[in-house]
Amino acid sequence: MALLTVDKLSKTYQATSKKAVKDISFAVDHGDIVAFLGPNGAGKTTTLKMILNLVSPDHGKVYFEGKETTNDNLLLLKNTGVLLEGSRNMFWSLSPLENFIYWGGQRGLSKAKAERSGLLLMKKFGLLDKKDTTITSLSRGMQQIVGICCAMIAQPKLLILDEPTLGLDLKSAQIVTNILQELSANGVGILITTHQLDFAQKVAQKILLINHGKLVFSDNVKESLARSNKQTLLELTLTRSLTLEEQEEISTYCNLTKKQMNCYQLEVKSQKALPQVFNLLGKLPVRQIQTKERNLEDVFEYYTEEG
């Protein structure tokens, strides 16, 4: 049984008649780290808010370990740690320690246990000396770390983290990565949103990609990239732009994408076509040509490009 099941969620905002989310379905299992990606305005935040009962769906249901959560906020509250929109799950006039005690109490922890759990997390991030400082006095990155600690305070079965590495330096982002991987190994299900695709590729086992309210891609990260990399991908830099005639000729053998001025990406449709491709490229004013391995950014661009 999946830890979290999202079944055909849909939402239209009446003020704009915009269908923000259209029949979204997915699952997060115990130990999964799932990255929920998409451009700004694609429907990620609306989906998260429906999962957390902050917005009511027009259709669809959410289940936690097989139990419907629509009318049971307590079930989610006890079992889910949440970081939404940066560090907004905190009281800004309080210290990190006071926030830990409050949020731990909301999830059934004693004051002593909440304090102990929070301080242990802050120690991992090297911020133990900031435990009594007000949140407003902390840097943006430190505030983000405290927000993450608040989400983790009661050792939840499920973590929902919105942009967990936003504003963090490389060292802190790596600590977040290590902690998420450790939690995953211990059976915690984790759903993250992020615009940092390198972080998503590093930490997530599964990718969900939403665009215009629809789920357009769902797959295992490593398996998907391994399949994609069986086809040759070339990055071509010229001294000028391709003419329309040249583009049409290359497109016979390749999926052609213009990356920037005079720079193109060529996905060779068949390995048998490589001789013809290189014959065509030999006639062009090539500045540089190199083979390239696909990464998550290529997948993201493919499924979200307009037109």
Model segments located where?
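A short, flexible loop at the N-terminus of ABC-type nucleotide-binding domains that lies
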Residues: 1-6, 10-23, 73
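ABC transporter nucleotide-binding domain
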Residues: 177-265
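C-terminal coupling/interaction segments
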Residues: 269-307
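Conserved ABC ATPase "signature" region
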Residues: 101, 105, 113-130
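Conserved ABC transporter NBD signature motif
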Residues: 60-71, 75-76
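Catalytic Walker B motif of ABC-type/P-loop ATPase nucleotide-binding domains
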Residues: 159-163
